[in-house]
């Protein structure tokens, strides 16, 4: 019963996603981390677990974070957005790029008016370590 109640507090129904925000984990390039690691780091910061909806690892794995029907917790003021985290800082491998491309295309079909941006476009951060708008125009 407690789990159901806490899920109701966090659950936001069918969120109308308007943005997709791309992040990086700001971990050393090439080091393997995953969604479970990020979940643990976020808990250690006193947060409610992983704030991203999707994590893309250097091994080419797409891992689920929090469900998309839960509000994200990854960009202040923009948490009705899908959050994707690329593991690394500014050097991502071909597998990561391919997964990101496919995931963005899939989400743009699911949410036709979705605006795709980098974390640095809504915050004074260097995250995600690349120019998302250039990538969208030239690589998507």
Model-derived regions, located:
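Short, small/polar residue-rich loop motifs at catalytic or cofactor-binding pockets
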Residues: 49-50
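Basic/polar, cationic surfaces and motifs that engage anionic cell-wall
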Residues: 5-25, 29, 58-62, 67-68, ...
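Short Gly/aromatic-enriched secondary-structure transition segments
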Residues: 35-42
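Flexible, surface-exposed loop/gating regions in the mature catalytic domains
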Residues: 71-73
């Amino acid at each position: 019963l407690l789990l159901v109640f806490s899920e109701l507090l966090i659950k936001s129904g069918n969120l109308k996603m308007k943005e997709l925000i791309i992040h990086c984990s700001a971990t050393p390039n090439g080091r393997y981390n995953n969604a479970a690691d990020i979940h643990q780091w976020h808990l250690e910061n006193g947060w409610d677990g992983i704030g991203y909806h999707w994590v893309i690892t250097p091994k080419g794995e797409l891992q689920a974070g929090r469900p998309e029907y839960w509000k994200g917790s990854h960009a202040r003021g923009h948490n009705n957005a899908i959050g994707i985290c690329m593991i690394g800082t500014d050097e991502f491998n071909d597998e990561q790029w391919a997964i990101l491309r496919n995931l963005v295309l899939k989400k743009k079909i699911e949410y036709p008016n979705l605006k795709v941006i980098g974390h640095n476009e809504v915050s004074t951060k260097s995250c995600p370590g690349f120019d998302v708008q250039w990538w969208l125009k030239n690589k998507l």
